[in-house]
Amino acid sequence: LEFFALIPGSALLIPLILCAALGLLISMTCLSTPSVSLEGKCIWILKSLPLSAQQILRAKLRFHNLLVVPVSMVAGLILALAYGCSPADVVFTVLTCGLLGLLCGLLGMICGLQWARLDWLTEAHPCKQSAALIFTMLGLTAVIVAGGLLYGFALRALLTPTEFLALFCLLLALMCLGLYRAMVTWGARKWEAL
């Protein structure tokens, strides 16, 4: 990132670059994706408990959020402070990283339910070799790339990087709300059908 200091005006882009880099790393921390498939042949144990499908799915999502979201936010905070971002940029970098972690968990739950494989031989299959995991990683990467392309080609003349980060946080929050709604409705029905 020191290279960008040599280009006039590029220091304003550092928060966007930090969010993109951390977002790509967050996309590889899909803890919620294999959580459905890892139940395997013992899924009947969870289904026999007096818990609704929504409670089970929320618990799996909470585990992902407990591990990924705080670490993502702290990483965003440390990097934003280390690179001398403005206070507003620090806030939006931290929020963006947290929302990307949440989006990763929600997208992982949806993909994990859609492409659940309960007939695996070793735990490596759902954790490292599943279609759900690939679609989750590629989906979050696509969101990050689409955000970068949106700013670079359409909104760069209209918005400052800080304003775009605020808009991107809003878009991420809306995506999270939509995916959460899908998880507790469609996802609960899909869980019952497994």
What is each residue range found by the language model?
Residues L1-W44, S52-L194:
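Hydrophobic alpha-helical transmembrane segments of membrane proteins
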